[in-house]
């Protein structure tokens, strides 16, 4: 962001809440969210691939030790919560936790750092830097969090049908909680709402927490003079580290719980 182009706190806040977009309306794509989420996913894969490739049976390095501790923690969590048998759940849980954590961590970067760099590039390309929009926290974009939740929802449906069969899955939707044919419409509504509420709440919970955290940083930067911002930024950043980690953990745990519920025979 070019500071000289933004004259009021309202314009500053509005500018920082605007995505770099392609298209308009419903079909618009938030390019910044897509870029950072994909880039951080690639970063996760590169780091873990290098650690796995260089893993030794001797004294491990600091990075290998950290990765092994993380893998052990996630594996133990999955064993406690997922009672079925699947070799994919633990890797999925690890991927979700690390990926969401990395995307959340973008909220700890100085609020003007990446927007100002992008504004400089935008200006060099001959465009007005006042229109160089950029948001760096993918999980503060509801499209990203709901897309991830949709992926979890598809996996829940897959495991439900795989473990119970299509007939068993349909029976679960139509014959619970009232086990009588006359209550099929009511059962279908109740079970349908319960099923759909899982991905919606999963995505909105992560989005709401990260959007609120990002907004607080923006408000501090937009409303306070620069010399006093650190008085609020530092304590909030320290507290926000807990939120960042906790939200990644909650997203992972709920994913495992939903898949465990889908895998259980009723």
From Swiss-Prot:
Enumerate the transmembrane spans.
28-48, 88-108, 141-161, 206-226, 237-257
Q: Membrane topology per the record?
A: Multi-pass membrane protein
Q: What is its main location?
A: membrane
GO BP, one example? proton motive force-driven plasma membrane ATP synthesis
Q: Which Gene3D superfamilies match?
A: ATP synthase, F0 complex, subunit A (1.20.120.220)
Q: Membrane as a keyword?
A: yes
Taxonomic superkingdom: Bacteria
- Can you state the subunit structure given in the record? F-type ATPases have 2 components, CF(1) - the catalytic core - and CF(0) - the membrane proton channel. CF(1) has five subunits: alpha(3), beta(3), gamma(1), delta(1), epsilon(1). CF(0) has three main subunits: a(1), b(2) and c(9-12). The alpha and beta chains form an alternating ring which encloses part of the gamma chain. CF(1) is attached to CF(0) by a central stalk formed by the gamma and epsilon chains, while a peripheral stalk is formed by the delta and b chains.
Q: Which family does it belong to?
A: Belongs to the ATPase A chain family.
**Annotated function:** Key component of the proton channel; it plays a direct role in the translocation of protons across the membrane.
Protein's UniProt name: ATP synthase subunit a
Q: Which organism is it from?
A: Pectobacterium atrosepticum (strain SCRI 1043 / ATCC BAA-672)
């Amino acid at each position: 962001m070019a500071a000289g182009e933004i004259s009021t706190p309202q314009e500053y806040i509005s500018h920082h809440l605007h995505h770099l977009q392609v298209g308009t309306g419903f079909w618009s794509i938030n390019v910044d969210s897509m870029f950072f989420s994909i880039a951080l996913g690639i970063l996760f894969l590169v780091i873990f691939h290098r650690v796995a490739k260089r893993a030794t049976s001797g004294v491990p390095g600091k990075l290998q030790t950290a990765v092994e501790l993380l893998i052990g923690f996630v594996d133990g969590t999955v064993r406690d919560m997922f009672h079925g048998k699947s070799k994919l759940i633990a890797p999925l849980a690890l991927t979700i936790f690390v990926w969401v954590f990395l995307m959340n961590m973008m909220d700890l970067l100085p609020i003007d750092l990446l927007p100002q760099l992008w504004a400089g590039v935008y200006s060099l390309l001959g465009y007005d830097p006042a229109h160089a929009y950029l948001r760096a926290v993918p999980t503060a974009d509801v499209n990203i969090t709901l897309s991830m939740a949709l992926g979890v929802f598809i996996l829940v449906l897959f495991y439900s049908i795989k473990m119970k069969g299509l007939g068993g899955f349909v029976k679960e939707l139509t014959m619970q909680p009232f086990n009588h044919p006359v209550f099929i419409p009511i059962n279908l509504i109740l079970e349908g709402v319960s099923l759909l509420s899982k991905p919606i709440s999963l995505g909105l919970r992560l989005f709401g927490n990260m959007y609120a955290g990002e907004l607080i940083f923006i408000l501090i930067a937009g409303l306070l003079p620069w010399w006093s911002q650190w008085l609020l930024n530092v304590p909030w950043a320290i507290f926000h580290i807990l939120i960042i980690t906790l939200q990644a953990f909650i997203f992972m745990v709920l994913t495992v719980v939903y898949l465990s519920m889908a895998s259980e025979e009723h």
